[in-house]
A protein has these predicted regions:
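N-terminal glycine-rich beta->alpha transition that marks the start or flank
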Residues: 85-87, 94-142
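Rossmann-fold dehydrogenase core element
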Residues: 306-313, 323-375
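Mid-domain Rossmann-like dinucleotide-binding core that forms the NAD(H)/NADP(H) cofactor-binding site
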Residues: 193-269
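Glycine-rich cofactor phosphate-binding loops and adjacent beta1-alpha1 units
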Residues: 257-336
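Low-acidity, Ser/Thr- and Arg-rich intrinsically disordered low-complexity segments
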Residues: 2-13, 17-22, 28-29, 33, ...
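C-terminal hydrophobic helical "lid"/dimerization subdomain
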Residues: 72, 347-409
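A glycine-/small-residue-rich N-terminal strand-loop-strand element
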Residues: 142-165
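Short helix-loop-beta connector
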Residues: 186-188, 211-217, 282-283
Length: 409
């Protein structure tokens, strides 16, 4: 098809959006310069550049989807306005990322709030590659694929996906296809955003690092945190024989009871190590997932079984603790920390692959996408993304039980 042979008038605000038409062809722009688009010919979509036109990008039942896209076009993103101990955010226009090989562009519908975001705002959360000057916040996102790059075979436009991604709090993201997880059919975008990072973290800690076997006992500190609750769910899903969850409040105890935790320990009034040894008749806990750190290290070593595994996931209670080297050696314990910050893109993709391998609805080729209700994330609050600062303040207050999710408009 000649790109100028079928022309119809169209008004366009040159911001990321989609429209539909029953007429195939090229749309005349009211902007004179720098339009980029896709020409839809018999051989399929192909890129072209023009100074006057935009074009359809896909066709379905004689309805054509167009993408209004201008060279240098801007989108909205939430960026760090200042780095300090309190959140400083601004919703600004930024240039969208270029789409590369084996990547997809996702129109973001929701992104969750994570504790690592608070460190990011404070300027203390760095990773491989450093921190860009105008940093877009957010570590995850859920949305719809709107563009597919060369070499992507498992996904198509219109697929609903979730991903761990730097800068997720934006109208669009570009992400490697290897980092994508399909959203189960019985989940919303909000649930996808709430789940993806927590499940990646919990699965990597519990299944990959601690090598949990069927029937083993698992203790999860700060079990009412986002990662903690999803670790509880995965421990049950993968056949833990005993699940112990710790919290410091009666509200937290009630929530953990509802999640099916076998033994809830309120550490504000009960000694964790003593109680863990009591309920295991002295044998101890096989796997301890620790989100607290600090003084909990010595309790974990006391509570651990011979050949137990202690996995440090977070340091809410501090980065330093007392280590009993004699007990560590006597029990032949494994003590290991996990983080995403020093992992390469390939290493993160391997974590995604392991999660998709072990939970069938997360596979791109899954015949059935409904996921078991026991794995549904707990959501405490949903806010519009222009209230991101309020969301971070709510998280800082430590009063929310469940994930806080921002809907992206």
């Amino acid at each position: 098809m000649n790109q100028r042979s079928v022309i119809c008038s169209a008004t366009a605000r040159f911001v990321p959006r989609e429209a539909s038409t029953t007429i195939p062809g090229i749309f005349r722009s009211h902007k004179p310069r720098g339009i980029q688009g896709i020409e839809f010919g018999n051989s399929g979509p192909r890129k072209y550049s023009s100074d006057r036109f935009i074009c359809i990008t896909s066709v379905n039942h004689h309805r054509f989807r167009i993408r209004l896209y201008k060279s240098g076009e801007e989108m909205k993103a939430m960026v760090i306005a200042r780095q300090s101990s309190s959140p400083g955010l601004a919703l600004v226009d930024v240039a969208p990322a270029e789409l590369g090989d084996k990547q997809v562009r996702v129109a973001v519908r929701a992104a969750s709030v994570n504790r690592a975001d608070l460190a990011q705002l404070a300027g203390t959360h760095t990773s491989i590659g450093g921190v860009p000057q105008a940093q877009v916040v957010g570590l995850d996102a859920a949305g719809e694929i709107v563009e597919v790059g060369p070499g992507v075979t498992d996904y198509a436009r219109g697929d609903r996906v979730m991903a761990m991604v730097a800068g997720g709090l934006a109208q669009e993201i570009v992400v490697d296809a290897s980092m994508l997880i399909p959203i189960p059919t019985n989940w919303s975008y909000i649930e996808g955003a709430a789940a993806v990072l927590g499940f990646m973290t919990a699965h990597n800690a519990l299944v990959t690092t601690a090598r949990m076997a069927d029937g083993e006992s698992v203790a999860i500190h700060a079990a009412t945190s986002g990662v903690g609750m999803q670790a509880v769910q995965l421990a049950r899903y993968f056949g833990a024989g005993l699940i112990v969850g710790t919290t410091r409040s009666d509200r937290g105890s009630a929530l953990l009871d509802a999640l099916g935790v076998d033994e809830v320990i309120n550490t504000s009034s009960t000694d964790f190590a003593a109680r863990a040894l009591d309920i295991t008749e002295g044998s101890g806990i096989d796997i301890v997932l620790d989100h607290v750190g600090g003084s909990y290290l010595s309790m974990n070593i006391q509570a651990a079984a011979v050949k137990g595994r202690i996995v440090g996931v977070g340091r809410l209670g501090g980065a330093e603790g007392l280590l009993d080297m004699e007990a560590l050696a006597f029990k032949r314990l494994e003590l290991v920390g996990v983080t995403f910050r020093t992992r390469t893109t390939q290493e993160k993709a391997e974590i995604v692959h392991a999660l998709r391998r072990d939970i069938a609805p997360f596979r791109p080729d899954a015949a059935h996408r409904d996921i078991h209700e026991s794995l549904r994330p707990v959501i405490a609050r949903v806010l519009p993304w222009n209230e991101a600062e309020q969301a971070y303040q709510l998280m800082s207050g430590n009063d929310m039980l469940g994930k806080i999710v921002l809907e992206v408009g």
